[in-house]
Amino acid sequence: MDLTGVRMDLVQAALGRIAFDALILNVQVVNVYSGLVEPGNIGIKHGRIVTCQAPKDAPAETVWDGQGRFALPGLIDTHVHIDSTLLTPAGLAEFMVPHGTIAVFAD
């Protein structure tokens, strides 16, 4: 599928017109702009979050229960010295990603 087709799918899924690839129900969505934490359901299409307010009964290939866990954007560590960790970049990623850090600026 070309980029235009993917974009159209993302929009159509966000509008509830086509099924999600995955749906995560019952999460607490952290809005980092307002500071509010609100219940939500996350709809995913082509590996991208397209909505945090999907209906519970929305069609999806895969459905998970988030069991009230928190959903928030990934963190970016803007200052890390990989050499002082005594890990390879891949080893550091194996440790950091499960804890929410998705990117680093390293020297």
Please report, for each region that a protein language model flagged, where it lies by residue.
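Metal-associated gating/positioning segment near the N- to mid-region
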Residues: 57-58, 66-107
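Histidine-rich, glycine-flanked metal-binding segment
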Residues: 2-25, 29-73
